[in-house]
Amino acid sequence: MATAVEYETLYTGQKIPLIGLGTWKSAPGQVKDAVKYALGVGYRHIDCAFVYGNETEVGEAIKESVGSDKGLSREEVFVTSKLWNNKHHPDDVECALRKTLQDLQLDYLDLYLMHWPYAFKRGDQIFPQNPDGSVQYDLTDYKDTWKAMEKLVKQGLTKAIGLSNFNKRQIDDIISIATVKPAVLQVECHPYLAQNELIAYCHAHGLVFTGYSPLGSPDRSWRKPEDPVLLEEPGIIAMAKKYGKSEAQILLRWQVQRKVVSIPKSVTPTRILQNFQVFDFSLSEEEMQLIGALNKNWRYIIPLITVNGKSVPRDAGHPLYPFNDPY
């Protein structure tokens, strides 16, 4: 039943599967079965984060699926997690990773990402708030956070470190002070947000590029009726019919051929399996260009909060907000 998987290689020599299982928005009670099923059908890459609130269940699934007596070794599974914004202070970074390792029941991660470039107020509140509903920030410099993350590699707690939701200027900042280079950049990426410049930049600087929400996050709670729907694009539907594949498989194949790692989220077995079955066909160069031409720099994932009764972008006012730059 298992499908062969293709990989990209990090500068560390690690191999990261081009398709992984995303776990954002996967509810406790569902995510354990989803991870177990995914590992059973051949997934070898699980993408996690502390803020998703489900790492304990993900850990149970890994424990029940991986081990010398289960035919799947720990070394065969690539596990990513992410440092949340309230733990950016250098003194908090190691504790944050150790908490994730405890929840996942692992001795080490394959990759640990800084989830966002800006810090929230130190403490145990995941979303510390001001009285008006806005977020309480902290001015910890991400370069100082990075230096603390480098120590985690030297301690053997993670094999590689990387960045999420950083722009080019911010990645340059990190590279300028790094003694352990970032191995991966993870950002939103799909045909409406093709990220061509950022992908080219990453590949030129030795970073593997991972795209989250590769299907356009159709299950996002803040969806508006007027938002464009990627899975309903006529050209994508036509290609799906031509190849006898789902629209999701066409979108994921496009990323595979661009050497972009994708982490589609699902808790539905049929979709988990479908999302993985993208290595047995290829899109033509013309089809790749047609999909690429859908780019409109449309960002689905902009966290929103309610401030004084109005819905506003959560972090757009922060000086380190990454999405004001062109890329």
Swiss-Prot record:
The record's section on Gene3D superfamilies has:
NADP-dependent oxidoreductase domain
Positions of NADP(+) binding: 13-24, 47, 164-165, 213, 215, 217, 265-268, 271, 274-275
- Protein location: Cytoplasm, Cytosol; Apical cell membrane
Q: EC number(s) on record?
A: 1.1.1.2, 1.6.-.-
Q: Taking the first listed entry, what is the main subcellular location of this protein, grouped into a coarse class?
A: cytoplasm
Q: Return one GO MF term.
A: S-nitrosoglutathione reductase (NADPH) activity
Enumerate the UniProt keywords alphabetically: Cell membrane, Cytoplasm, Lipid metabolism, Membrane, NADP, Oxidoreductase
Q: Which domain of life is it from?
A: Eukaryota
A GO cellular component term found in this entry reads: cytosol
Active site annotated at which positions?
Y52 (proton donor)
Enzyme class per UniProt: oxidoreductase
Biological processes per GO annotation:
aldehyde catabolic process; cellular detoxification of aldehyde; lipid metabolic process
Site (described: Lowers pKa of active site Tyr): K82
Record-linked Pfam families? Aldo_ket_red
Give me the reactions it catalyses: a primary alcohol + NADP(+) = an aldehyde + NADPH + H(+); S-nitroso-CoA + NADPH + H(+) = sulfinamide-CoA + NADP(+); S-nitrosoglutathione + NADPH + H(+) = S-(hydroxysulfenamide)glutathione + NADP(+)
The protein's matches in InterPro entries, at most eight in alphabetical order, are given as: AKR (IPR020471), AKR1A (IPR044481), Aldo/ket_reductase_CS (IPR018170), NADP_OxRdtase_dom (IPR023210), NADP_OxRdtase_dom_sf (IPR036812)
Q: What does this protein do?
A: Catalyzes the NADPH-dependent reduction of a wide variety of carbonyl-containing compounds to their corresponding alcohols. Displays enzymatic activity towards endogenous metabolites such as aromatic and aliphatic aldehydes, ketones, monosaccharides and bile acids. Acts as an aldehyde-detoxification enzyme. Also acts as an inhibitor of protein S-nitrosylation by mediating degradation of S-nitroso-coenzyme A (S-nitroso-CoA), a cofactor required to S-nitrosylate proteins. Also acts as a S-nitroso-glutathione reductase by catalyzing the NADPH-dependent reduction of S-nitrosoglutathione.
Which protein family is it in?
Answer: Belongs to the aldo/keto reductase family.
Name of the protein this chain belongs to: Aldo-keto reductase family 1 member A1
Q: Which organism is it from?
A: Xenopus tropicalis
**Source taxonomy lineage?**
Eukaryota, Metazoa, Chordata, Craniata, Vertebrata
